[in-house]
Amino acid sequence: MITEIFPFSVLILALLIDIVLGEPPAALHPVVIIGTAVDRLRRMMPRRKISGMIISVLVISGAVLAGFALIRIAYATGSLAGSSEMGDILALIISSYLLKSTFAFKSLIMTSREIGNLIDEDLDAAKHLLPALVSRNPLNLTHAQARSAVIESLSENYVDTIVSPLFYYVLFSCAGLGVEAALAFKAVSTMDSMLGYKSDDLREIGYVPARLDDILNWIPARLSLPLIMIASPRKSMDILKACMRYHSVTPSPNSGWPMAAAAGALGTRMAKPGVYTILDEGRDPESEDVSSAISLIGRAMVLAALLSALLLILLR
C-alpha cells in the first residue's frame, strides 16, 4: 500500500512544506538531530579512520531505521484505529516531513540572496554571514571574491541539497524506501560537513565520511550539468566547454561540475584564493551576477523537482 500510494504525493507535499513553511525548528529538524548524534559520537571516539567508519555505520543505520520506523508506525496507527485512510494520511505527512528535511530549496535561495545583497551594502556584515554558506575564511575577501564564494556555494549546494536527495529518493522509491534513502544520503552529507576536513584533528576520523560523500554525490554532480544547461539553453555550449575544462580543478571530484557549469552560464571567474580558479578567462563577478546565479539555480531546482515528479509517475 505504501509503495503504491506515496512516492509522488510525498514529493509534492514535501516541496509545498519547503516553499510555504521553510525549515522546521532546530529541535524537530532531523538533520539537526543527526548532527547532534555525529558531534556526540565524535567526542567519544579516538581520532582514527576506524572511528569514522563506526560513526558512519551508526549514523546512517540510525537515520534509516528511524525513518523506516516512523513511517510504519504512522501507517500502523491508522490501521489499529480501524481506518487505513487515516494511516495513509499520517504516513504521508511523516514521510513528507522527513523528505523535506533532506533538501532546502527556499533556504538556499533566501540565504544566497540575503548575503549577495549585503555584499554591496556592507561587506563586513556580509563576511559575518558567509560562513552559513562557505567554509573558507571570509576575513580578507574582496567584493568580487565574496560574490564568487556565494555563487560557488549556491551551485555546489544545488547538488548536495537538491539533486542528490531527490536522486536517491526517486531511485529507491520503487522499493518503498525512498525517504529512507534520502535520509541516508543526508546523514552522509551531514557527517562530511562536520568531519570531512583535512585539519589535524579531523583528517583521520573524517576520511570515511568524506569518501562516502564523494561516492554518493558522483552521479548527481554530473547530472547537474545537463540540468543547468537546460536551465540556460542559450549558454549551453559555454556551460559544456567550461565543465569539460574546469570540472577537475577543485579538490573535490564533484563540486567542480556544478561550479564550472554556473561559471560557464554567467561568464564569470570563480576562485578560492590559493586553491583553484574556474574560468580564469572570465570576468570578476559583479553585483548582478549573484542575482543571475540565483535565477539560474532556481530554474535548475525547478527542473530537478519536475524531473523527479515525472519519473515517479512513470515508475509507479
Curated annotation (Swiss-Prot):
Transmembrane residue ranges: 1-21, 50-70, 89-109, 165-185, 294-314
Compartment annotation: Cell membrane
Biological-process GO terms, alphabetical: cobalamin biosynthetic process
HAMAP family: CobD_CbiB
Function per UniProt: Converts cobyric acid to cobinamide by the addition of aminopropanol on the F carboxylic group.
Family: Belongs to the CobD/CbiB family.
Listed name of the protein: Probable cobalamin biosynthesis protein CobD
Gene name of the record: cobD
